[in-house]
Amino acid sequence: GYSDVIRSSMSPDIPVDSPAITFADTGLLTKQCTNYLSSWGISKRDAEQAVKYALNAQKQYSSDIRRKAENIVRESRRKEEPIILLAGRPYHTDPLIQHKLSEMIANLGVNVISDDIVRDNSEIETQDTYLIKQWAYMNRILKAAEWTARQGNDIQFVQMTSFGCGPDAFLLDEVRDILHRNGKPFTLLKIDDVNNIGSLKLRVRSLVESLKQTPLRGTTEKFRTKEV
């Protein structure tokens, strides 16, 4: 893991802590945090209280960021302005990594939302895929693609990918199929392939201009399976 990479590239005189932490089980998360923090002289009571506050803050953040995206959608539709759902990994929020791509899209007159709009949305199902959904961020990107596919032509899907990141190798095919079955294009931006955003800007501008020429959606296709 990352902790091993960091530890092997630093001076052995610098200690690196890498406790095992899970976020899948609240009880286990609390236990792991209290055990680790106890080594720093923090009491079990304070540690448990801190975890409780942190979980509440995370829940509030998820709600706030989803509500913000929903407000952007409502306001954009009121003004009849186009929207792009820009999906990616957590590290794509770093302007240096994404080359300020979201700002560039906004400068083209398109409002930008993220895949956070489907956070905690249990109404969206992604059963029509061949993937085993075991990664949280991958699942959210799939849900975001499914949500976009159900929307009008005013909302389009653009995905950033970098370094051939792990599950992207097969995730991209599934996202493409979801969108194409619903008559929508899939725009993929490999942002680690460029040093400037000129080519990326051209791709996005082409998408925006094509939407002006083809405002109607295609016909939705059924999910295809084959007996084995």
Question: Residue spans of the language-model regions?
Answer:
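An N-terminal assembly and electron-transfer interface module characteristic of large anaerobic redox
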Residues: 1-228
